[in-house]
């Protein structure tokens, strides 16, 4: 029978592995991004995917304290979690909502849906009529991403429809950049420039029907690279968390990483030369070695693709990870450092002393991208706000 003598909230979340999150860094990053914008240009903090793995409520509060005015999420559930946490600022649901019940929840909780079609507009108006309320919406237009958004050829017609529906209030028109993070700075005739031109052409054609409150196009890359992409509002995700998506301009901005992943050494092993390590024995010791087992694995978000290629930090010094990363554990070679003990803190991502490991490092090893890496840390890793 389970004992209840120790309250769960008394258990140290750092007993095995955890994620550290710095709201101060998020606030500082928001202020740094805010300084790049004209005074009248607003900043939407994109906090989808649980704030890119940092904790959406923590990120939202820090970003709003740093000058963000709006929040962007991908799903209705993400928006509802923020509302239930007491966050009252404008929230845009960036993903498509196709069920009447979802749109009903949107109007009840004062959330703004994204419209990509006439069907969605008519459904929103019908729901708003049933509540005898005005429904604030944004229209998304596809200028080259070929994902969500109204076909550009139908955009004027959709905007006119929304303008004519008495229970809808058009609060924004937006699009999304497809290549802003990969095109060279200042590249002539870039695809980003073409997207901007298409967006501006559309806006100029619909202005007689009334300018929407927000026109927005720029993501983090567009925000950092080109002021001409800012319009009335920018949508910032990755940069909010301390990372520039622009490889050629990575060090040009005062951004602070807001997250670290740490774990503890759980066992020490002294093994002879020619000892196979972990599944498949992909690593064989070439000398008598001291190995440390670390309590974190791919079920926590440490990709198996990093096996035998990554390093970790202990007290500011790098140590190689060896053998296959397993579901719950990985192994590092600490032969040169006998002072490491069970319980020593291992930094897998983040700053330790004068050294650091970044999502860029992991992405270059694994073929992933920083966005995916930050979103990969699972529920088993408690978030510790520092």
From Swiss-Prot:
Protein name: Alanine racemase
N6-(pyridoxal phosphate)lysine PTM sites in chain numbering: 48
Keywords (A to Z) from UniProt: Isomerase, Pyridoxal phosphate
Entry EC no(s): 5.1.1.1
Amino acids binding substrate: 147, 327
Family as reported in the entry's similarity comment: Belongs to the alanine racemase family.
Gene Ontology process terms (BP): D-alanine biosynthetic process
The keyword Isomerase appears for this protein: yes
Described purpose of this protein according to its UniProt entry: Catalyzes the interconversion of L-alanine and D-alanine. May also act on other amino acids.
